[in-house]
Amino acid sequence: MPVYDLFFKYITLMQIGNTPAQIKSRSPLAVIGEWTEMIKLEHTVFALPFALSGLILASPQLPGLSTVFFTILAFIGARSAAMTLNRVIDAGIDRANPRTKDRAIPAGRIKPGLALFFAVASFALMLYAASNLPILCLQLSPIAVFWLSFYSFTKRFTWLCHIVLGIALGGAALGGWVAAAGCLSGAAPWLLALAVSTWVAGFDVIYACQDYAFDTSERVFSIPARFGIARALLISRALHLATVASLLGLGLSLHLGIFYWLGFTSVAVMLTYEHSLVKADDLSKVNAAFFNVNGFVSIACFITILLDKIIKF
């Protein structure tokens, strides 16, 4: 039997159960799909563009391919580890929540032990990538590991969990900046990180409104559970106003050009549109607000920052 087949059967046994019949029912693509769904690979569109934006803004010219490669590799490792840990730590909560009970770990399709191994391997990948970037990246890695691990516990004791998540993703922008500059001097990297942090926290509050009934009944901490949906949406708006203010400060501090300001205007319009989709008494468009609009926000920022670097008027 080929080595690949043996390896695949071993991984499949560790994941889902114990019988050859179960193995035959799972193709390699199905297993890969299960894992990519668990770590929500499609949500990479939220933070990776901002990590690359930090990389571009901190570079005097366009960054080299090696720097771009190891920055992306570090991001993939960090994000995969964080999402996997979140799924393992929250498995009990997810199992009790009708919206999340069919996720891979609570449904028994992926075993927690294998998921933890994957998380450790992902952190190792992040550390390897960081070792190929400026030394400050490696020196800051323990803070990243701690914060990414810490987030998953916060919904058990504080409604500020959304802010903690925002800071985690804001760290991606700082990581990109350090990968290019080797330091965090001046206001600009912190304004970029603040923009990302408040943006993520704001849309996470909107997303959490879906679980208001469950969170209040099960004593899961969140801004909607603490303040109610209507006030939570107001808090989300305030956070997104801070996002716009931070991006304004970033553009002014770096004297960015016309493309950046086109992106800035687009982001302000899209965030306004996002909040028009969601009402306290109508959450039917939360998914559209969460994924579609916010995906465009991060991509618009990245593309316009890249164009601003390449084309000068």
Where are these regions (language model features)?
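N-terminal amphipathic/basic-hydrophobic helices that include classical n-h-c signal peptides
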Residues: 1-13
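Cytosolic, membrane-interface loops and tails of multi-pass inner-membrane proteins
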Residues: 15-33, 83, 87-110, 205-230, ...
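Extended hydrophobic alpha-helices typical of membrane-associated regions
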Residues: 29, 249-313
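Intramembrane alpha-helical segments
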Residues: 32-38, 73, 103-191, 272-279, ...
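Membrane interfacial helix-start motif at the N-side
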Residues: 33-42, 46, 109, 155, ...
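Small-residue-rich segments of transmembrane alpha-helices in multi-pass membrane proteins
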Residues: 49-54, 165-178, 226, 291-304
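Membrane-embedded alpha-helical segments that form the functional core of polytopic membrane enzymes
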Residues: 50-53, 57-91, 99, 123-127, ...
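Multi-pass membrane catalytic core of lipid/isoprenoid biosynthesis enzymes
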Residues: 68-73, 91-141, 217-258, 262, ...
